[in-house]
Design a protein with these regions (language model features):
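Soluble extracytoplasmic regions of secretory-pathway and membrane proteins
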Residues: 1-305
């Protein structure tokens, strides 16, 4: 088989494997319900301009035309929804759809993550960075086809801003309730921005032995991680292993590390998928979604020939 593959198949792969590729494509179309009896294929369907009558009659499309571009709107999200210097949003945001009044509507969506690269000097010591500023806060969405008002004058700072729907620790706005995008657990411990630390040390040490919470939640409250993630570092052997990995003696010496402590690491959702399923080819971006009241990261993965 190896000789056949090397001297016959590889030099003529397109011809030799065309039959099997065709079967794969046919099976994929069948699995996704894209067979010819269900889908009509039209050549050059967009070559002719649409008439005014056709545009006027296509209410579903026109009413959902995007006014917000997820590739360029991130600075506006940051300016209006960052809240604290240590929170942030990715440079490029994502699109998602939610069922509003029995219709799927486009939203620009983002998770308000901890940004380790935005911490001030007094926030960068080991205790603050790895045991206090551990998680993000909330889900922010904006209808892609809406802005607050039209900017009527050139250079005007009024109008053209997103209409935000916010669910976070401080509030769940009425708009979120009406649209059904309500988050029951707004704390975010994993995400691409969280994992973007320039020194590669994106880990967080969580868990309390005394019941005293130390993780920053809001200006008036703290929190202790209650999730199932992370690795137990309550014993000296695990502490030593992670201390060696990150070249950090505080993991052994600090009183913040106790018998109930866990370490959260490898916090980029896409990289986590690569670790457990290296045979998958993943999309270059991940995006957050509200599912059953929780913020979850969607990673699109594909098997390839």
């Amino acid at each position: 088989p190896a000789m056949m593959e090397r001297f016959s198949v590889q030099p003529n792969r397109a011809e030799k494997e065309s039959e099997y590729i065709s079967r794969n494509i046919e099976s994929t179309r069948y699995a996704y319900g894209l067979t010819e009896d269900k889908v009509t294929y039209q050549e050059n369907w967009g070559a002719k301009g649409a008439t005014k009558e056709a545009v006027a009659s296509d209410v579903a499309t026109v009413s959902n035309i995007r006014l917000l571009d997820p590739e360029i709107i991130s600075p506006t999200f940051t300016q209006l929804q960052q809240l604290k210097n240590f929170y942030g949003f990715p440079e490029s945001l994502a699109m998602d759809r939610y069922n509003i009044d029995n219709e799927l509507r486009d939203f620009v969506v983002a998770a308000r993550e901890i940004n380790p690269n935005s911490l001030r000097e007094n926030q960068k010591n080991w205790i603050n960075r790895h045991t206090v500023y551990t998680h993000g806060n909330g889900f922010v969405a904006a209808r892609a086809n809406q802005v607050d008002e039209v900017a009527r004058d050139v250079g005007s700072a009024r109008g053209g801003y997103p209409v935000f729907t916010v669910s976070d620790l401080q509030t769940t706005d009425e708009n979120a309730k009406k649209l059904g995008i309500v988050v029951n657990e707004p704390r975010i411990y994993y995400g691409p921005l969280i994992a973007s630390a320039r020194d590669g040390k994106d880990y967080a040490v969580v868990g309390s032995e005394t019941g005293n919470s130390v993780e920053y939640d809001t200006d008036s409250s703290t929190y202790t991680y209650e999730g199932k993630g992370g690795v137990d570092i309550g014993n000296v052997f695990n502490r030593a292993a992670f201390a060696a990995r990150y070249q950090e003696m505080n993991l052994i010496l600090s009183e913040r590390v106790n018998s109930n402590s866990k370490i959260l690491f490898e916090r980029d959702p896409r990289q986590r998928v690569h670790k457990v399923a290296p045979w998958l080819s993943t999309d270059s971006t991940t995006y957050p979604a509200v599912i059953d009241g929780r913020i979850k990261w969607i990673v699109d993965g594909y098997t390839t020939l």
